[in-house]
Amino acid sequence: LEIKKNGLYVDATFGEGGYSQAILDKGGKVLGIDLDAEQISNFKFHPASGGTNLSLVEGNFADIEKIAKENDFFPVNAVVFDLGLSMRQISQSGRGFSFKKLNEPLDMRMNTDTEMTAKYLLNHLSESELFDVFARNSEEINSQKIAHEIIIKRQFKKLETVDNLTNCIDRAIGEQDNNAYKRIFQALRIEVNQEFDNLKKGLTGSAKIIKDDGKIAVVTFHSLEDRIVKNFSKTQGIRLLIKKPIMKRSEKSFERSAKLRILGRKSHI
């Protein structure tokens, strides 16, 4: 992003502060936003960065334009989105984001002040509605079978914990399949947090607060997110500054799936 000293940068998915810290270390000023209050409260920035260059806001990046203007933080040099979960959310949040945390509740809320949970969806949606959630948010090939198995299971006992859901998936497809787990958990998390709608709003708001030569950097982790970013690049005078996404070679599967796209204004060539 070519960080400029005293330049303004919005870290729209603050997380554990990695992007913000890198920008601060190069002399930039950061407005960090995160929907998860625990992410902000747990952050410890390096003293050398100086606290005055970092402002943190608990909020939804769907409201990025409003948040930036309320904090008198615009126009900005760049906005950064990293759409993956943080390691803390996966391993320590206790909200059932990971299919490996078998005893955790099926919560999956980024913002625990909201009411909608994965547990509610699994125990109240109809079979056709569950199928729609799974197919639309993950394109899981066994969505219909899994939705049907959930309906059968909950007639006898509500789905409460992660292992209740993974057991349903096992029975539906006849085997243990980590990829199926990942896709179904992804689909529920997206639905609970309205991630696709928020991303569209966040990109739209970002386009309104960047400078004429400003950039929007987005790291996605699956094709549905990436599709939203590519489609957005054809609207509102925005274009992809680099045609092909930047990808990282890594032994870690989640890093291999990451794609970085850089967007900017068409008028700035």
Regions inferred by a protein language model and the residue ranges of each:
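S-adenosyl-L-methionine-dependent methyltransferase catalytic core, i.e., the SAM/SAH-binding region
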Residues: 1-46, 51-269
